[in-house]
């Protein structure tokens, strides 16, 4: 999908679901990584993540466009355009737009992080940490015993 196709799609969705024209620019932003799209308050433009179109197709892209158009139209009307505002939530429900977009497949893989488990050699108390701990510097907070890395640190 080209930029011109995207612009026409956003204009069509705006007229179809909101009965109002979209008079600004919609573009794909390759720098977006964790969000489906964003509405720029200063310029009134909408930026969308092309990875969502490639991963889930046009249906998911239209859902993201509807969400961003809710921000757009409410902001131009001077109403509550933020996620926490009741005007925004009501309009989302009215046009059946999602509040959040689905996570991309590669995002789900990135969340599985290593967990380090340290065990006290005296009282056997377990400590779970995301980062490695210098066992020469730190001791058990309960009894002062030496900490040992358990099972190579993975769970």
Curated annotation (Swiss-Prot):
Give an example GO cellular component term for this record: cytoplasm
> Mind telling me which Pfam families this protein's record contains?
SprT-like (PF10263), Zn_ribbon_SprT (PF17283)
- Coarse class of the primary localization is cytoplasm
Question: Which molecular-function annotations from GO does this UniProt entry contain?
Answer: zinc ion binding
Q: Where does Zn(2+) bind?
A: 67, 71
Give the required cofactors: Zn(2+)
Mention one GO biological process in which this protein takes part, according to its record.
response to stress
Co-factor remark: Binds 1 zinc ion.
Family named by the database record:
Belongs to the SprT family.
What name does this protein carry? Protein SprT-like
